[in-house]
UniProtKB/Swiss-Prot annotation:
This is Holo-[acyl-carrier-protein] synthase. It catalyses: apo-[ACP] + CoA = holo-[ACP] + adenosine 3',5'-bisphosphate + H(+). HAMAP family: AcpS. NCBIfam families: acpS (TIGR00516), pantethn_trn (TIGR00556). Its cofactor is Mg(2+). Its EC number is 2.7.8.7. It is an enzyme of class 2 (transferase). One of its GO terms (molecular function) is magnesium ion binding. It comes from Staphylococcus saprophyticus subsp. saprophyticus (strain ATCC 15305 / DSM 20229 / NCIMB 8711 / NCTC 7292 / S-41). Pfam families: ACPS.
Amino acid sequence: MIHGIGVDLIEISRIKNLYKRQSKLVDRILTINEQHKFNQFNNEQRKMEFLAGRFATKEAFSKALGSGLGKTVSFTDIDCVNDEDGKPCIHYEGYKVHVSISHTEHYAMSQVILEV
């Protein structure tokens, strides 16, 4: 049974501006596993796409959960890593989580479906 569906869309330029102004942004948004992947990218545009995609995923997850970020879950409580096929995955106790992330040059979006 579906518990919730969440969608988020963000401008990559917004994340890029935050990244330039806030030195701790990566630590606030990404888990250690996600930071490892982020640091593997040499291209700044690809780093911003990844960061924006994970930001959107965590927002979408919190919307699907029904609580929003900050109430019951924070950015670093949500670990979105890729499986061996490259598919983004979130493991969260009590739920089967379906994740889709996409981006263009200017936008990143994510959809999350939670099943119980």
